[in-house]
Amino acid sequence: MTKRVALEPAFILHRRPYSNTSLILELLTPNHGRVCALARSARGLKSRYKGKLELFSPLLISWSGRSDLKFLGDVEANGMPYLLEGEALLCGFYLNELLIRLLHHDDPYLRLFHHYQNTLEKLVNGRLEATLRCFEKQLLDELGYGLPLSCDVEMKLPFKPDQFYQYLPDRGFLLCEKSEESEERDVFSGKSLLALQEESFSDESSLKEIKYLMRLTLNRLLGKKPLKTRELLF
């Protein structure tokens, strides 16, 4: 039986040409997660989708189909587009590439959908690096790979800002005897871990550490194929 979905909130993560006049879209939706849909005749001069299928624009989208590739139906605007420019636009592309690489089709991601929309708004108005780190943390949490940021793995004590902790994948953070001059790349200050826990990124040195920690963690999920947008960012 053909499944039909009517006017689901959505963002377009990616679009690519298909045949002479159509497009294949990668969508992010709250109740159906990542959805792949064929927009037939979307590139035609008289297409009903003309001007509607833009990235970073909140939409209401209908589709039908039983296979992984759905058939796009009605599309309506669901708010003003987020106008990203320059580095903010690259950040938006980075978010989209992350989601395409890490999300499965047809798994609901209600909270992640709202995190994504809030992140787009912050990219328009706020600090880019801090906004990306916050979204990466939220993404890991939603995927079930969130970092254990409540305490150290051995003593079960809260992090202290003047202490240092070694990151042990699949376990957590172990209190260790390291100094700020340490060149160990898997050692992080308690100050930085507390900043990540609280999603407060006012300190530039902590932000640099958190960026490395996020990359270290995400790389384990992404595998050997690098993200194209990382080569362009910062």
UniProtKB/Swiss-Prot annotation:
Q: SUPFAM superfamilies from the entry?
A: ArfGap/RecO-like zinc finger (SSF57863), Nucleic acid-binding proteins (SSF50249)
**One Pfam family this sequence matches:** RecO_N
Q: Which InterPro entries match?
A: ARFGAP/RecO, DNA_rep/recomb_RecO_N, NA-bd_OB-fold, RecO, RecO_C
What the entry lists under Gene3D superfamilies is as follows: Nucleic acid-binding proteins (2.40.50.140), Recombination protein O, C-terminal domain (1.20.1440.120)
Cellular component, GO annotation: bacterial nucleoid
Question: Highest taxon of the source?
Answer: Bacteria
GO BP: DNA recombination; double-strand break repair
Q: Which UniProt keywords apply?
A: DNA damage, DNA recombination, DNA repair
- HAMAP family with a match to the protein in the record: RecO
What is the purpose of this protein? Involved in DNA repair and RecF pathway recombination.
Q: Which family does it belong to?
A: Belongs to the RecO family.
**This protein's name:** DNA repair protein RecO
Per the UniProt record, the source organism is: Coxiella burnetii (strain RSA 331 / Henzerling II)
